[in-house]
């Protein structure tokens, strides 16, 4: 079937008036490559140019007012090519002086007794408006004098040019309707054609809100249709592996562990085991705070797979993390399981032998990085794929690993506790297990906040920990100094400063510009206590486990979000020793102060993630480009979570009733297939 589009155009992008080769190249830089892209390039905000009554305006407010020109404008030139135009208007029965700087050409346009609309800053005492925009009363400008769309543009493209291009395209395209008449009527929604037109050219605020609501619901509904369809495919597949593990051997393994499972771990194990026994493929997210013991839960599941005759795989984001997992699992399993490590560093004969053992079934459990998804990595009988910190992998990487075991069971793990509203959006098709309990014997990390002038006192506190034979992390937001952020400390300067205080051999440096090999070497030295202090950027945020590290200093902590601060803090507090986290910050904003205060009040990652989401929004919560969040143009999973729930219910009803598979929805089914390529629909 040919490509299905939401928007169809009778001509190509370069046929629109004013779009030549140069403009075409600039538009492509904005990711506008077709007429459909152009029409869906929505404004980022709107300038409110609604005319108001000047009698009601506050002093020093930016106002848009309409009045009659009652004096001829005058222009005074001064300085080098500078000018001041003065004109008097009668506005709402008030005589007002209006001034415009460096716009002398307006003199010819401002005719005596004409009606004009002016936008500028109102000075009540002087009865004067410092103007920055003027609208003359021809029809085109009248349209702009209400809610004016503002687009993200780049040098070489003007707002007006882009608005004109979009206006022409909108007059000629066909916009298909995805929502049924019944659904639109039920929730009082507009047609998509009217909605997109309005988002570009709103008549008023109420009209704009209705359009935004319609488009957001359409996006969420389409997203949920994809989720629900995927659910149906998962549950009706006859390829799913049913794991008949040996429960007695599993119990013996759990009893042999050198510690007792927490109640939360036991609940998670039982939930996963129920999934493994079911005749449908497991698709579960295991989320738990830093240090909550997710790896032990994963290990028990891997052991269960071994007793059932299946292999398991664990994919993690970094080599150092893969090595740590492999080492701890080898110790945990002893001779009961054959654990292997596959990273980019494993090469030549060693790699060939490992792949041979994997394919013939000698290896029970394979731990690795993205090296696991290479074409020559073939499993004998994989029954469980575990991905750690899954929002740090691209969707395609996860999909390839999953497909190495056809319809194998999938467990995703994350130490970033995800608020319920976001979990629905990111992992909507998954069941979720949460570990909200720390293992016995762990002491809560003591978190404090110090100002920059208290730095020496913080150093003294760190020195006390080092004297006990412990280790410390020192975290900085920047790698090198920045002219834009002169007051922000950088990691290289701080590293050099600490070297002079503690000696070159005792201080290590870690940042994102280093090669993977150099980073691993530094982390290895820190793990083996060859280094006392590790000065680093946030590259240590994920999964690094050095139990002897009990002190963390985070410099310029107000530069980080709550979730990042919490993940960083989680690098300490990983043993029975008391750990400390000191935030050094002198925040200048209310948000910065609030963030520091919250961090000192709670160590609950679930509570912090909710607060972080409220303060920063979903894109920042996960980090740009890594999030796995659906790429909505209008909808916001936090602000629109109630709408998301309604969309999910409606999508579930459409699929479960079977209506979705009728002829009338064939166009929609094909669109979802073609535009969500990372999902298998066969």
Curated annotation (Swiss-Prot):
| Record keyword Acetylation present | no
Question: Where does the Helicase C-terminal domain lie?
Answer: 454-614
Q: What is its EC number?
A: 5.6.2.4
Q: Which Pfam families match?
A: DEAD, Helicase_C, RecG_dom3_C, RecG_wedge
Keywords recorded for this protein, A-Z: ATP-binding, DNA damage, DNA recombination, DNA repair, DNA-binding, Helicase, Hydrolase, Isomerase, Nucleotide-binding
Q: Which residues bind ATP?
A: 288-295
Q: What class of enzyme is it?
A: isomerase
Coiled-coil parts of chain: none
InterPro entries the record matches: ATP-dep_DNA_helicase_RecG, DEAD/DEAH_box_helicase_dom, Helicase_ATP-bd, Helicase_C-like, NA-bd_OB-fold, P-loop_NTPase, RecG/Mfd, RecG_dom3_C
- The ranges of region (Wedge domain) come to 50-145
SMART domains, sorted: DEXDc (SM00487), HELICc (SM00490)
The UniProt GO MF terms for this protein read:
ATP binding; ATP hydrolysis activity; DNA binding; DNA helicase activity
> Residue ranges of the Helicase ATP-binding domain?
275-435
In terms of Gene3D superfamilies, this protein maps to: Nucleic acid-binding proteins, P-loop containing nucleotide triphosphate hydrolases
Where is the motif (DEAH box)?
388-391
PANTHER family reported for this sequence = ATP-DEPENDENT DNA HELICASE HOMOLOG RECG, CHLOROPLASTIC (PTHR47964:SF1)
Function in brief: Plays a critical role in recombination and DNA repair. Helps process Holliday junction intermediates to mature products by catalyzing branch migration. Has replication fork regression activity, unwinds stalled or blocked replication forks to make a HJ that can be resolved. Has a DNA unwinding activity characteristic of a DNA helicase with 3'-5' polarity.
Q: State the family named in the UniProt similarity comment for this chain.
A: Belongs to the helicase family. RecG subfamily.
Q: How does it assemble?
A: Monomer.
The protein's name: ATP-dependent DNA helicase RecG
Organism equals: Staphylococcus epidermidis (strain ATCC 35984 / DSM 28319 / BCRC 17069 / CCUG 31568 / BM 3577 / RP62A)
